[in-house]
């Protein structure tokens, strides 16, 4: 009888030991497998910021301050000039724009088309270049503001020139090949600047060797020739336009007042090329 009890006790111990061993053998792989199975899921979650939707969101965020982050593929050997935009600033009650009968069609919030140029032809050439003017003593501001790289609107950071047809001229320092231009007048409120003309030359007096690359003076009121370009409402986008590889050292901009007042204003001019 004692032997039977001892045998039973030993058997019970063996059974308990076998039970625990079997339990560990069945549960341990399960735990290991669950870690391995969860690892890809966790890795996937950690990469959630690299999904196509997230990349598009990041691209949209990156493009908030630029005009030219467009997803369309470009021809080989072509690049898009990336023009940084200042924040929009429309102050006060918008004035009625009168007498603007040559306006470009409404863009309904769409940006201007990007300026596409050959590789190596989209360098900003005008930064901190010397600026001269038909009004050498501006009413407000300094001529150097026009190429200082500061495009944000500020009541003390733009240039105001006298009424009538006035010009500002940028000296690029040497002959350059120009492929694109963007000009910002005063975009504090919607307005149209009259007779906006851009010319390029190697002659600092603009008597000879003149190429007109933009002209919206439709009635020749500034005596620079009749232009085929359209007037436009000033916004924080400025007015970008392509230039067909015109060579010259000097770039001159004309204007003749605006629909808000008789003055001529400039915040920044950017010239791109090589």
Model-inferred region functions:
Residues 35-122:
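N-terminal pre-domain segments of enzymes
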Residues 115-150:
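Predominantly extracellular/luminal regions of secreted and cell-surface proteins
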């Amino acid at each position: 009888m004692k032997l039977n009890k001892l045998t039973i006790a030993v058997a019970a111990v063996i059974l308990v030991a076998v039970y625990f061993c079997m339990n560990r053998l069945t549960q341990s792989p399960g735990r290991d497998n669950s870690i391995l199975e969860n690892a890809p899921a966790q890795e996937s979650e950690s990469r959630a910021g690299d999904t196509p939707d997230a990349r598009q969101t990041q691209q949209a965020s990156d493009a908030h301050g630029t005009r030219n982050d467009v997803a369309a593929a470009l021809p080989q050997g072509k690049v898009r000039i990336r023009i940084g935009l200042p924040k929009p600033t429309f102050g006060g009650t918008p004035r009625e724009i009168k007498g603007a009968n040559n306006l470009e069609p409404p863009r309904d919030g769409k940006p201007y088309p990007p300026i596409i140029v050959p590789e190596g032809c989209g360098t900003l050439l005008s930064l901190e270049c010397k600026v001269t003017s038909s009004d050498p003593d501006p009413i407000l501001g300094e001529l150097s503001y026009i190429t200082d790289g500061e495009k944000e609107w500020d009541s003390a950071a733009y240039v105001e020139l006298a009424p009538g047809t006035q010009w500002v001229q940028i000296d690029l320092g040497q002959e350059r090949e120009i492929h694109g231009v963007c000009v910002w007048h005063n975009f504090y409120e919607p307005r149209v600047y009259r007779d906006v003309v851009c010319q390029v030359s190697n002659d600092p007096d603009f008597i000879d060797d003149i190429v007109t690359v933009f002209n919206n003076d439709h009635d020749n009121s500034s005596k620079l020739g009749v232009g085929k370009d359209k007037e436009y409402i000033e916004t924080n986008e400025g007015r970008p336009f392509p230039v067909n590889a015109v060579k010259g050292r000097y770039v001159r901009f004309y204007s003749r007042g605006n629909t808000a007042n008789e003055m001529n204003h400039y915040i920044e001019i950017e010239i791109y090329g090589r």
